[in-house]
Amino acid sequence: FYFQNFFHPDLTVRRQSGFLLPRFNNSNALGASVSVPYFYAISENKDMTFNPTIFYESTKMIQTEFRQKNKNSSLTADIGISRDFKTSATNKKKNAYHLFSKLNKNLDFKGFNKSNLNFFIERVNKDTYLKIFDSTLASDSIKPKNLDLLNSGFDFFLENNNYSLSGGANIFEDLTKNRNDRYQYVFPYYNFSKNIKSFNFGFLNFNSKGNN
């Protein structure tokens, strides 16, 4: 085994499995903790990072991030489970978890300059999960930026020399609201733009957008 800096290596270069530098943390909600991540190179285009964390107050957490990069697609999935976490509401030990995932796909349609499709998932089973474990979670590109708002759905983008079309669907979950009011659904939505005619002094375009 060997120690290396805590970063996700370029998937195009040869990687080696091994322990990453340990991480020490202290938070008001969880107290002191230590993490000893392990990087596992599955193959040339796939790898995982196991990140077990032990807290002084007996709470235990394991976070696993999986990454795969193919010729026309990339997948990142981050799963974390915390055991024996004591909630302030009931003072009982419970388990908490999160799931973050993002899939980017280049559809490679003929006749199009760009043709991309993306899926994304953000889920937690406890409303204050992100606020409590934010400083403990390994930093990555798919962790929600807003600790009170989750977003799951998909989007796409098509572009050729004549027009462009984008659209998708979103499910927003506001963790600060009660169960009946927290969800906002935006699907489908679209944005269409077409070049109708070009002139010496400019262009004539048609644009349309909308959502349900």
Where are these regions (language model features)?
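Outer-membrane beta-barrel proteins and related beta-barrel translocases across Gram-negative bacteria
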Residues: 1-212
